């Protein structure tokens, strides 16, 4: 554990230091289960789960308990009835990072681990993809080329959804996005019913603004980080691999890429990265990194070897 020479709100860890904070937290995840959680191109193994994610799960578990005590103290001050132990105030976790950095895998692994704690078994995961405007609306607004940028999301709907969950509504509904069809599925909904923990994963979830933003409702937040050059290479590699997986489906919006040669696919992927994903990362996503409670830093081989925890 290292503290910067200048006063800082952060504490930095290497993996050896971080894994010592696991204490006796048990590993309740099998290799078979991990395979189902691992994203395309991700290299996460059970050792990384033990050394990185179990200490993280322990930290969040402690913070969930502390947050509930804080809510109880506020209720006592206001003279309100104590909350029903079967319906605690949901703990909201934000997971942010670039396209292709592995934030979806991080969110899924975290969900699986947190749901195994007796005190918070109901853990829901929602991605902000469902809050993108439908393609027809993006076309009307001339925003198709900005898909994934902050302005391409229905931020009011996202705010209403998270506020509804946080305020203890019986249920809240999130739209569903199809990566196959590259659009919102009309009429489809993901129903969230008073979870103990809600994980919200997306590119721009740590965005701030002059008014109340969804990040203001987070109790804990993660930023999955890596060198921009490494993320670009991961994106290109994933694009190449998808020619024989997602793109191979005739129903896929990107089916035409399935017939591309390696060289054609590399050119196409790098152009998408250069014109869309990199600008969004540099202009909108990366500037939100300082807001994260914990930054997970990946090396070129996808492994997490450095972490930065916000202590203030």
From Swiss-Prot:
The pathway is: Cofactor biosynthesis; coenzyme A biosynthesis; CoA from (R)-pantothenate: step 1/5
Per UniProt, the keywords (alphabetical) are: ATP-binding, Coenzyme A biosynthesis, Cytoplasm, Kinase, Nucleotide-binding, Transferase
In the Enzyme Commission scheme, what number(s) does this protein have?
2.7.1.33
The record's InterPro entries line, in alphabetical order, gives: P-loop_NTPase (IPR027417), PanK (IPR004566), PRK/URK (IPR006083)
Q: Name one GO molecular function term.
A: pantothenate kinase activity
Enumerate the residues binding ATP. Answer: 97-104
- Where does the protein end up? Cytoplasm
What enzyme class is recorded for this protein?
Answer: transferase
Task: Tell me what reaction this enzyme catalyses.
Answer: (R)-pantothenate + ATP = (R)-4'-phosphopantothenate + ADP + H(+)
| GO BP terms | coenzyme A biosynthetic process
Decide whether keyword Nucleotide-binding is in the record. Answer: yes
- What Gene Ontology cellular component terms go with this record? cytoplasm; plasma membrane
Relay the record's extra comment: Was identified as a high-confidence drug target.
Q: Which HAMAP family match?
A: Pantothen_kinase_1 (MF_00215)
Q: Which family does it belong to?
A: Belongs to the prokaryotic pantothenate kinase family.
Query: Could you tell me what this protein is called?
Result: Pantothenate kinase
Question: Which organism does this record belong to?
Answer: Mycobacterium tuberculosis (strain ATCC 25618 / H37Rv)
């Amino acid at each position: 554990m290292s503290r910067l020479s200048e006063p800082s709100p952060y504490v930095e860890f290497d993996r050896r230091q971080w894994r010592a904070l696991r204490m006796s937290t048990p590993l309740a995840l099998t290799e078979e289960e991990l395979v189902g959680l691992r994203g395309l191109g991700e290299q996460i193994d059970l050792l990384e789960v033990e050394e990185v994610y179990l200490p993280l799960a322990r930290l969040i578990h402690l913070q969930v308990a502390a947050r509930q005590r804080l809510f109880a103290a506020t209720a006592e001050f206001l003279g309100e009835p104590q909350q029903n132990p079967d319906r605690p105030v949901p703990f909201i976790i934000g997971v942010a990072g670039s396209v292709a950095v592995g934030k979806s895998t991080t969110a899924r692994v975290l969900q699986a681990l947190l749901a195994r704690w007796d005190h918070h078994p109901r853990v829901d995961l929602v991605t902000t993809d469902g809050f993108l405007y439908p393609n027809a609306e993006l076309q009307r607004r001339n925003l198709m080329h900005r898909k994934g940028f902050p302005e391409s999301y229905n931020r009011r709907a996202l705010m209403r959804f998270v506020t509804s969950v946080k305020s203890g509504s019986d249920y809240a509904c999130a739209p569903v996005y199809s990566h196959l069809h590259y659009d919102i599925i009309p009429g489809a909904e993901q129903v969230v019913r008073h979870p103990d923990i809600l994980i919200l994963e997306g590119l721009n979830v740590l965005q701030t603004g002059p008014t109340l933003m969804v990040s203001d409702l987070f109790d804990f937040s993660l930023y999955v980080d890596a060198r921009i050059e490494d993320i670009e290479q991961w994106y290109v590699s994933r694009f190449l691999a998808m020619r024989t997986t997602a793109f191979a489906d005739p129903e896929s919006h990107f089916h035409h890429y399935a017939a591309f040669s390696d060289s054609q696919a590399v050119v196409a992927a790098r152009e998408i990265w250069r014109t869309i994903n990199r600008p969004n990362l540099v202009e909108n996503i990366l500037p939100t990194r300082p807001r994260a409670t914990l930054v997970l830093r990946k090396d070129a081989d996808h492994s997490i070897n450095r972490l930065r925890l916000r202590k203030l």
